[in-house]
Amino acid sequence: MVAAEDVIPFLGRPSHWTIGRSAYETAHSWFDAAGRLPAALAALLATDPALAGAALERATFEKQTRLDDFGRPSQTDVLAEISTASGPAILAVEAKVDETFGPTVDEWRAEGSAGKAGRLAGLVARLGLDPHAVGPLRYQLLHRSAAALIEAGAAGIGDAILVVQSFSPPGLRAGFADFRTFTEAMGVPVREPGVLSGAVERGGTRLRFGWAQDAIRSERAAPA
C-alpha cells in the first residue's frame, strides 16, 4: 500500500470509507505519519519505559487472524510490528469514532450458532478469564486480544499491546467504560486514556492495553 485509499478494497463495505468515520480516519492517521507511529499512539507507548522509543517496522491494515476451527477470523484494523527499548512487540489497533464494541458475550452466544461454545472456551482459556464472569464483557475485545497474542506467538515476539485508537471527542470517549471493564477483568485496568496498563503474561507473551485519544484528520495538526 502506498496511499490511504489503498485500504478501501479490504474494508467490509466500501461505505465504511467516509470522512469522519474510523476506517477513513485510521488509514489517514497512519499514512500521514509517514513511516512513523501516529503521534497519539507513540505518546501512549512512551508511558511505559519498557516500550520507550517505539518505532514502526511494518503494519498491515485489516489483518485477519485465524482464532480456531469454529468460525471466522478476527480482523484487526491495524496490526503492526514495532521496535522498542525491550525488543520487538506486536501492536494491535482497534479504531473507533462513536461505534460500540458490539455485543456482549451473553448477547453474542444467545444466537446459539454452532461452534460458539468451542470458540468462547478457547478465548477464555487463552486470556485467562473467569468463564463464569465473561457474560457482560464485549466479545470483540476478547477476540481482538486473542488475535494479538496469536500474532505475537507466531512471530516469536514476547510483547503484545492492544490499543484503541479513539477519534471520539474527549468528552464522549465512546466505548471507554466497556474497555475499562474488560481490562479490569484481565487484571490490568486502563483507568484513563493516554496511559498504558501494566502487563499480564498469557502463554509466554506479555499483554498490555491502552486507549490512545486521537483527533479526526480535519482537527489534527499537520505532522512536523
Which role does the model predict for each range below?
Residues 1-43:
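Charged, often low-complexity linker/regulatory segments
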Residues 1-2, 50-61, 191-195:
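Trp- and S/T/G-rich repeat-edge/linker motifs of beta-rich repeat architectures
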Residues 34-35, 41, 49, 63-68:
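C-terminal globular interaction/adhesion domains in large, modular proteins
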Residues 96-166:
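Catalytic cores of nucleic-acid endonucleases
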